[in-house]
């Protein structure tokens, strides 16, 4: 990136100059932004197509509002790259999604333009309603509030909770519905169909063009001409379409309009500012706009691998050749569905991320993508399960948090054998704290009836799923985004609540839960000739193997527990609870886990090392532990 190549962006310390830029300058800035995005994708995987689609919308917003004092919330936040580029972060943009660099999501620690650190979908309207309410109470009524939410996130239940509240309060608020007909994959559901009807209704499309012509003739808003225009729109729209969903909720609906026409959006944004009460502006955009490969395949280019050229050819990178756990999970699900016609799979808009496309194609009648509606996904699974079906909820660990109450009431309390496949459990590297799946161990093991397990290597994943589908209780299987370790031994059969001993040791034992088994084995191998370290594949955190806990602590040798999850309430805590229940001496237990803080973004191996979870750091802890034990016995 050079100043000569991107002079408009390089000259921005904040977004205030955009208010005085001409249409030509704004259009040129859009070209610069897309060039920067393409340059970035030559170096790393990042959110791409969604950012390409909001370039003009971002420029229009910053040219009409001053978001140093006004409020702007980007729902989910993966589409904030243009926003970062025009708010003074151009010079640091090449650090995005790298350790110590810019986050790939909004981050208040970076800029006053970012209000919330986000990454999950659906809450923008709620926080915007709250911001507006608070500003009114704090006598800050001149501050304007804008929420930008995509049509993929719009069906979230919390969105309609917010609209319900916004309509009742009646406070001034602008909601931008960024409609690109996509979530990560193609969106699903009746809300999507409703938005399609709004986009395609020939009567309203004609009305839109007439309103556009009138807008062109009205230089300023807030006068009788504007009010007349608004009344005309309301009357004609009501006559053509009847009572519309948003209008019936007390939300003024405007649109749909072209989300790539900056002057047009500027005029409509001014209309929104002058319209009293909550307003929803329906903006139609194209995901991947301005870059042909992304526009033609927005699913692949949502977060594509790094480019080899501007044609979108992926860079060939070195690989350990091992498929990720996600691939093994998909294959195990497919095999289970072949064997048993009662097995279904439910995902919440993560078909691509969970690599479920082959399952969807082979078993379309038993595949359910419910959209970004995790609470519904879990309750829906409970309903299926009650009829005798065997549903699998295939979901990212961090997104399962959104359905906590449904796990409690609809599944655990009913003791229904729903299977939760918790993908992306552990560190998700460059996505940062909103996407790390580090809390599921703690919050899932709280519930009675739930059986919780984690594979230490690839072969175990299918074994665990097969076992889970035989249970009469709910169960969860956690696994990371990482490539899967392949067993070098014949795996022991899966027995509920039983660990697997990988190797015996005379000096101490490492007890690893899940994918941390790979680091445990590597650490033990590093110490060969120095210490004889046993390695245990815990397999279960609930019920934990009490006999294994007793055996590892019975001879006074040290024990190191490993988990790719938070230290509080995790596997190490479960290990100590079992030890205390058995009245065992726990002084030689060392818990290695992620710290009790929000882990930022970076390379997974780097983050593991920082958290004392790399093989090298684990080996160092073992040396220290052995020394402590030796000094205690007088050696």
Swiss-Prot record:
Homodimer. Catalyzes the acyloin condensation reaction between C atoms 2 and 3 of pyruvate and glyceraldehyde 3-phosphate to yield 1-deoxy-D-xylulose-5-phosphate (DXP). GO terms for cellular component: cytosol. Mg(2+) binds at residues 151, 180. Signal peptide: none annotated. InterPro entries: Dxylulose-5-P_synthase, THDP-binding, Transketo_C/PFOR_II, Transketolase-like_Pyr-bd, Transketolase_C. Binds 1 Mg(2+) ion per subunit. Binds 1 thiamine pyrophosphate per subunit. Belongs to the transketolase family. DXPS subfamily. It comes from the Bacteria. This is 1-deoxy-D-xylulose-5-phosphate synthase. The keyword tRNA processing does not apply. It catalyses: D-glyceraldehyde 3-phosphate + pyruvate + H(+) = 1-deoxy-D-xylulose 5-phosphate + CO2.
């Amino acid at each position: 990136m050079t100043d000569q190549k991107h002079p408009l962006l390089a000259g921005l310390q904040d977004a205030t100059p955009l208010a005085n830029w001409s249409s030509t300058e704004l259009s040129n800035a859009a070209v610069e932004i897309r060039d920067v995005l393409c340059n970035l994708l030559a170096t790393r995987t990042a959110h791409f197509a969604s950012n390409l689609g909001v370039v003009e919308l971002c420029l229009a917003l910053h040219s009409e509002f001053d978001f140093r004092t006004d409020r702007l919330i980007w729902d989910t936040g993966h589409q904030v790259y243009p926003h970062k580029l025009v708010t003074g972060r151009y010079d640091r943009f090449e650090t995005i999604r790298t350790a110590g660099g810019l986050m790939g999501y909004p981050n208040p620690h970076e800029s006053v333009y970012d209000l919330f650190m986000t990454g999950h979908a659906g809450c923008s309207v709620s926080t915007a309603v709250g911001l507006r309410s608070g500003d009114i109470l704090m006598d800050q009524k001149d501050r304007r509030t804008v929420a930008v939410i995509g049509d993929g996130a719009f069906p979230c239940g919390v969105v309609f909770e917010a609209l319900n509240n916004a309509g009742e309060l009646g406070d001034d608020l602008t909601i931008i519905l960024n409609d690109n007909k996509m979530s990560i994959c193609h969106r699903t559901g009746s809300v999507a169909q409703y938005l399609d009807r709004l986009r395609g209704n020939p009567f309203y499309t004609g009305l839109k063009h007439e309103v556009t012509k009138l807008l062109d003739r009205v230089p300023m808003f807030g006068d009788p001409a504007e009010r007349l225009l608004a009344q005309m729109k309301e009357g004609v729209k009501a006559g053509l379409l009847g009572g519309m969903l948003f209008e019936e909720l007390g939300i003024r609906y405007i649109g749909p309009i072209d989300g790539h026409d900056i002057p047009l959006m500027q005029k409509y944004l001014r209309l929104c500012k002058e319209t009293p009460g909550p307003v929803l502006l329906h903006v139609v955009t194209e995901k991947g706009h301005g870059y042909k490969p992304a526009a033609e395949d927005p699913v692949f280019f949502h977060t594509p691998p790094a480019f080899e050229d501007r044609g979108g050819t992926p860079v060939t990178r070195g690989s350990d050749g091992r498929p990720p756990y996600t691939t093994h999970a998909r294959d195990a699900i497919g095999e289970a569905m072949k064997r048993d016609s009662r097995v279904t799979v439910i995902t919440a808009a993560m078909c691509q991320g969970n690599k479920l496309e082959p399952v969807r194609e082979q078993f379309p009648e038993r595949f359910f993508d419910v959209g970004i509606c995790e609470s519904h996904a879990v309750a829906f699974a409970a309903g299926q399960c009650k009829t005798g079906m065997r549903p699998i909820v295939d979901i990212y660990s961090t997104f399962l948090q959104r359905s906590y109450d449904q796990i409690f009431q609809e599944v655990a309390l009913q003791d229904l054998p729903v299977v939760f496949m918790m993908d992306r459990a552990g560190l998700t590297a460059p996505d940062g704290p909103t996407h790390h799946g580090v809390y599921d161990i703690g919050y899932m093991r709280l519930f009675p009836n739930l059986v919780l397990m984690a594979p230490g290597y690839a072969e175990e994943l299918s074994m665990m799923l097969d076992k889970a589908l035989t249970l009469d209780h709910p169960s969860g299987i956690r696994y990371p985004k990482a490539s899967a370790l392949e067993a070098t031994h014949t795996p022991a059969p899966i027995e509920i609540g039983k660990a697997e001993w990988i190797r015996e040791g005379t000096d101490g034992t490492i007890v690893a839960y899940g994918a941390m088994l790979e680091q445990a084995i590597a650490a033990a191998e590093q110490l060969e000739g120095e210490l004889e370290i046993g390695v245990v594949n815990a397999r279960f955190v609930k019920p934990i193997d009490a006999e294994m806990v007793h055996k590892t602590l019975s001879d006074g040798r040290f024990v190191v527990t490993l988990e790719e999850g938070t230290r509080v309430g995790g596997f190490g805590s479960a290990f100590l609870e079992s030890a205390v229940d058995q009245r065992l001496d726990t002084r030689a237990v060392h818990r290695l886990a992620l710290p009790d803080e929000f882990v930022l973004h970076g390379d997974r191996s780097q983050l593991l090392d920082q958290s004392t979870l790399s093989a090298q750091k684990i080996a160092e802890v073992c040396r220290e532990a052995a020394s402590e034990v030796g000094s205690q016995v007088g050696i």
